[in-house]
Amino acid sequence: MARTPSSEAHEKVLEAAIQLIGERGIEGASMDAIARLAGVSKATVYNHWKDKDALCVDVVNRLRVAPPEFRSGDPKRDLLSLLTHLAQANRSARMHKLLPRIVGYAAANPRFAEAMKRNSLGPIESQILRILDEGVSQGVLPASMDLQTGLLLLLGPIMYCRMTRGKVPPNLAAEVLERFWGKWP
């Protein structure tokens, strides 16, 4: 199927945004500069995205790998599968270069942070919370466990390694899960 001029412009803008954000950060990548690099008008950019935050959310969505749904019925196995997927996904050099810039921008821009959480992190968080809730329902995790704290304990080490090192040690997902699971009687 042939691409339309509009879809070609969309792709060019996304690629230009990825390049400029990687070089300058989100604050330094103006919509004018993105349009110039993409070879389109600024109006074309705004026809596809209402603002730079919306464009940046699409940039992240373009580079991330959405996790599959894990539903084996065994919460520990599902968590290991999901955490392993997250540890191994998005190892591209482009994502490694962009991630600290995106997180820094999100820290200073609550509206962007909320859009990122809803569009990019939300599905991951929802799946972890669902699996933890299944563990509580099955009695393999305590009813008193705070699910949000569990989410942070499981996801934090992987995200930290991804941000600071660009890669996650191969055994980290299993180690984090074993320590988390071992905490509960």
Segment roles from a protein language model:
Residues 13, 28, 51-56, 66-67, ...:
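Short amphipathic alpha-helical segment with a characteristic S/N-K-E followed by hydrophobic residues
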Residues 38-49:
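Short hydrophobic/aromatic patch on the recognition helix
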Residues 48-49, 116, 120, 155, ...:
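Tryptophan-centric aromatic hotspots in well-structured domains and transmembrane helices
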